[in-house]
Amino acid sequence: MGASGLVWTLTIVLIAGLMLVDYVLHVRKTHVPTLRQAVIQSATFVGIAILFGIAVVVFGGSELAVEYFACYLTDEALSVDNLFVFLVIISSFGVPRLAQQKVLLFGIAFALVTRTGFIFVGAALIENFNSAFYLFGLVLLVMAGNLARPTGLESRDAETLKRSVIIRLADRFLRTSQDYNGDRLFTVSNNKRMMTPLLLVMIAVGGTDILFAFDSIPALFGLTQNVYLVFAATAFSLLGLRQLYFLIDGLLDRLVYLSYGLAVILGFIGVKLMLEALHDNKIPFINGGKPVPTVEVSTTQSLTVIIIVLLITTAASFWSARGRAQNAMARARRYATAYLDLHYETESAERDKIFTALLAAERQINTLPTKYRMQPGQDDDLMTLLCRAHAARDAHM
């Protein structure tokens, strides 16, 4: 497994301790973290991940350290894409701002448990089946294709997520109330003990993360077959996810090309896995069951490609006119959906805050070059959504 039982035990204790400290100091007391707090906490967890990488250099050598940092950076990038979906889920269910930290921490804990299971299943497949790399490579190429398709990006909207099988089953079989009760999971309604919608949100977040594991775990095994490093990179990237959510909440919509960058990364790793599978080929109908000479891609080269793609993706998202247009429309869609999903009991201050953000997004759309603005016959769904939000505002006033 690449590490002794003692090292595994110490690492698990460290991760569990960090999660416990995070809960006690930052989540147990209901509050919305300030930007300064989010920056400090995010920097702390990134620093811990880097210190762990330095420890890998000292005790394992530079080659293992490169593998760890490649896995950590890849999983961190994929996690940012996860955050976008978490943001859609939280907004579509109208989760109170004060309760969002608990939802995120639950999602992280659930993800850590499920992904650990996926890691060991993946390791078992690699060890016992010669064709496992072909399977992993194919999965990554399919995932890359889905991310690269515009329809794949649009499918991650609020209504699609709320219609998911997991949510429909939970909503059918669990007795839930219509309203939130702070950050509590249970409440009393009509003298009956019921679950609050917060539980449905946690189920949605946890269920969604299971789907994300299908691309993240094969991607990490494409960079290293060291199970311990895959686990450590996954754990440390997840630990900083809650703080990262509040830090880049307002920036997520700006990363409009992130999914395309991730598609390139997943496609690259998928091809790398296919090449490695061909190099060690034992499948009878491929080259008569003999290894196929292929180009070898080192982990250092993989890390370089990952860094370059992420830098280009980020720069293009922030500087291109098309990126600014997609950002404005994504923000308008998100705030309009959030406003329409508000309960009548929602405080006026929260309602006004969301509608003000919607107006700001609409103003940004109006300042765009004409060719990037919404035109008749295009983005009709968004225009309809905005009209509904304004009608709801007028009715509430």
From Swiss-Prot:
Alphabetized Pfam families for the sequence: TerC (PF03741)
Keyword Oxidoreductase among record annotations: no
Coarse class of the protein's main subcellular location: membrane
InterPro entries: Integral_membrane_TerC (IPR005496), Integral_membrane_TerC_rswitch (IPR022369)
Membrane topology: Multi-pass membrane protein
Keyword entries, A-Z: Cell membrane, Membrane, Transmembrane, Transmembrane helix
Location in the cell: Cell membrane
A GO term from the CC aspect: plasma membrane
KW Metal-binding (keyword) present: no
Transmembrane segments: 1-21, 39-59, 76-96, 103-123, 124-144, 194-214, 219-239, 255-275, 301-321
Signal peptide location: none
NCBIfam families: R_switched_Alx
Family the entry assigns: Belongs to the TerC family.
Protein name: Uncharacterized membrane protein Mb2742
Species name: Mycobacterium bovis (strain ATCC BAA-935 / AF2122/97)
